[in-house]
Amino acid sequence: MSKVGTSDSKNTLYCSFCGKSQHEVRKLIAGPTVFICDECVELCMDIIREENKSSLVKSRDGIPTPKEICKVLDDYVIGQNHAKKVLSVAVHNHYKRLNHQTKHNDVELAKSNILLIGPTGSGKTLLAQTLARILDVPFTMADATTLTEAGYVGEDVENIILKLLQAADYNVERAQRGIVYIDEIDKISRKSDNPSITRDVSGEGVQQALLKIMEGTVASVPPQGGRKHPQQEFLQVDTTNILFICGGAFAGLEKIISARGRSTSIGFAAQVLAPEDRRTGEIFRHVEPEDLLKYGLIPEFVGRLPVVATLEDLDEASLKKILTDPKNALVKQYQRLFEMENIELTFADEALGAVARKAIERKTGARGLRSILESILLETMFDLPGLEGVEEVVISREVVDGTARPLYIYADRSDRAAESSASA
């Protein structure tokens, strides 16, 4: 039923699906003799999304087309259209190669691992995680800064394969078709141009150790993790068909690219990389293998990463969308927190723009948005549980800039500007 006919609530409307009243939900949508609340609409959308994702994975012998992959990436990742296209094609070709490698023996298709280059907070990790979710394959992440050569204090390279095996519930066959994302790959660049000066166990040494598993080898993985012991039984995992995606911010690489452009370009080509005010992401578009070698990656390692996808700095419009559009957008998260206190949280459009500009100034990208919102809402979240009668909190551009306090709107509407005075 959508209405209850008691004397005290005869005009109250109820959701026909979950039974909640109009006072318990934010929106109640009316249809012919039925009503549905915003929470049920969101639940239905989630169900449809999951079904679409399942049908996507099952189509074409389990290989979605590049356009299908890119379309799903669009639902989770804002912007970065060039990187999405590069990744969609590379991943499609990789799994097509796996499904057909036993059918044709005349041409052997080589594996194409991927290198993601982009500024901090541009979405490298999110892209890799979303790809694994789309394809329904085991996925693991590793931090390159914790890896060391075998025999030294730190994490063995083969522990990455162990984590992938754990993600596959120790199903070796599934693990061998998984995706490994290695973050902070730029931090293992060679510390010196002369490779023989010192033993570089966390730089060039790790690159050397990664070569074999990235190209394809049978790794002996101890089931319990940690260092190997002679008495242990090892699991044999073939890494030939595991897709490796490496990502890094590569701070300073833009200077190497720009220097190459200035030294090699003359005449009409001289303007390609010359402007110093170009954004880092735009300069990354022109990266060449020789730039990565100068940065400190060894030639063999660069050769194992034939597909390079560059990500751009997120502009103000993209950061505003990140704040509001995704399913778990930050603004939606804070609005849900305030709903628990029966208070509506509203951000003015100019306020969202100011938050985005702050993130750009700090050069933190999307990763810095949460800390900015946290600092803006700290005093409000501290005060509200002890205040009575507050119905809505409005965040304006002045609040973000620090020249005003949030506007508290009380239920009786008689004191709309109680907390809007400029802060000292």
From Swiss-Prot:
* Binding residues for Zn(2+): 15, 18, 37, 40
* InterPro entries from the UniProt entry: AAA+_ATPase, ATP-dep_Clp_protease_ClpX, ATPase_AAA_core, Clp_ATPase_C, Clp_protease_ATP-bd_su_ClpX, ClpX_bact, P-loop_NTPase, Znf_CppX_C4
Question: What are the alphabetically sorted keywords of the record?
Answer: ATP-binding, Chaperone, Metal-binding, Nucleotide-binding, Zinc
| The UniProt record lists the keyword Zinc | yes
Q: Name one GO cellular component term.
A: HslUV protease complex
An example Pfam family from this entry, by short name, is: ClpB_D2-small
Q: Where is the ClpX-type ZB domain?
A: 3-56
Q: Which GO terms describe its biological process?
A: cell division; proteolysis involved in protein catabolic process
Transmembrane residue ranges = none
Q: Which SMART domains match?
A: AAA (SM00382), ClpB_D2-small (SM01086), zf-C4_ClpX (SM00994)
The answer on whether this UniProt entry bears the keyword Zinc reads yes
Name a GO molecular-function annotation: ATP hydrolysis activity
- Residues annotated as binding ATP are 119-126
Q: What Gene3D superfamilies does this protein's entry cite?
A: 1.10.8.60, ClpX chaperone, C4-type zinc finger domain, P-loop containing nucleotide triphosphate hydrolases
PROSITE patterns on file: CLPX_ZB
Q: What does this protein do?
A: ATP-dependent specificity component of the Clp protease. It directs the protease to specific substrates. Can perform chaperone functions in the absence of ClpP.
UniProt lists the family membership as follows: Belongs to the ClpX chaperone family.
**Assembly and partners?**
Component of the ClpX-ClpP complex. Forms a hexameric ring that, in the presence of ATP, binds to fourteen ClpP subunits assembled into a disk-like structure with a central cavity, resembling the structure of eukaryotic proteasomes.
Under what name is this protein listed? ATP-dependent Clp protease ATP-binding subunit ClpX
The gene it comes from is clpX
